[in-house]
A protein has these predicted regions:
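Acidic/His- and Gly-rich active-site-bordering loop/insert found
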Residues: 2-131
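Carbohydrate-associated surface elements
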Residues: 134
């Protein structure tokens, strides 16, 4: 597959990718607060479904802390191909003090700025935004 083909597909899928990211950002998966335990589980469940929607298999594995999500893509003749590990985390930091937020941190928005469009919301740059690059 040529690089131009891959880049064209990324451009074609951009709006859908942003919608997927905004969905994940709406889940308040704050792992440092036990009150958000169910939200962390919900984020893991969401990721399993999202990975599966991309044509991969995915499973949620329990750990002593929060669940780990593992996805696999198994192309034909994969036994002779190298393995690639894509690692990231789906939890976010607390929003305290909430008074410093201009908007609800879990109601992400695409905003126009002087430097172009940005996505604002808790986790958009640590680490849900990076996680969704797959």
């Amino acid at each position: 597959m040529q690089l131009d083909t891959v880049l064209a597909q990324i451009d074609a899928d951009l709006n859908n990718s942003v919608i997927r990211l905004l969905e994940l950002l709406r889940i308040p998966s704050i792992s440092t607060d036990p009150a958000f335990r169910q939200d962390c589980d919900a984020a893991a469940d969401w990721l399993v479904l999202d990975i599966e929607s991309l044509g991969a298999t995915a499973e949620k594995h329990p750990t002593p802390g929060y669940p780990m999500v593992v996805g696999h893509i198994t192309p034909p003749n994969s036994d002779c191909l190298p393995h690639i590990l894509f690692y990231g985390h789906y939890d976010v930091q607390p929003v305290d003090p909430i008074e410093l937020w201009n908007k609800d941190p879990f109601d992400p928005q695409v905003e126009d700025t002087m430097k172009g469009k940005v996505i604002r919301g808790r986790g958009s740059s640590d680490d849900k935004g990076q996680l969704m690059t797959f």
